[in-house]
Amino acid sequence: CYIQNCPRGGKRSYPDTAVPQCIPCGP
Protein backbone atom coordinates (compact mmCIF):
# COMPACT_ATOMS: atom_id res chain seq x y z
CA CYS A 1 0.00 0.00 0.00
CA TYR A 2 1.30 3.45 -0.78
CA ILE A 3 0.41 6.51 1.28
CA GLN A 4 0.85 9.48 -1.05
CA ASN A 5 2.56 8.67 -4.33
CA CYS A 6 0.63 5.84 -5.94
CA PRO A 7 1.88 4.23 -9.12
CA ARG A 8 -0.54 3.53 -11.97
CA GLY A 9 -2.91 0.81 -10.72
CA GLY A 10 -1.33 1.06 -7.28
CA LYS A 11 -3.02 1.53 -3.94
CA ARG A 12 -3.32 4.36 -1.44
CA SER A 13 -3.51 4.05 2.35
CA TYR A 14 -6.37 5.55 4.39
CA PRO A 15 -5.02 6.27 7.92
CA ASP A 16 -8.29 8.02 8.72
CA THR A 17 -9.88 4.89 10.16
CA ALA A 18 -8.85 2.80 13.15
CA VAL A 19 -7.56 0.20 10.72
CA PRO A 20 -5.65 1.68 7.77
CA GLN A 21 -7.49 0.68 4.60
CA CYS A 22 -6.03 0.42 1.12
CA ILE A 23 -8.02 1.89 -1.76
CA PRO A 24 -7.23 1.64 -5.49
CA CYS A 25 -5.32 4.67 -6.75
CA GLY A 26 -5.88 6.09 -10.21
CA PRO A 27 -8.19 8.14 -12.45
From Swiss-Prot:
Metal-binding among keywords: no
Modified residues (Glycine amide): G9
Keywords: Amidation, Cleavage on pair of basic residues, Disulfide bond, Hormone
Record flagged with keyword Disulfide bond: yes
Domain of life the protein comes from: Eukaryota
Coiled coil: none
GO MF, one annotated term: neurohypophyseal hormone activity
Cysteine disulfide links: C1-C6
CC annotations in GO: extracellular region
Family per similarity comment: Belongs to the vasopressin/oxytocin family.
Function: Vasotocin is an antidiuretic hormone.
The protein's name: Vasotocin-neurophysin VT
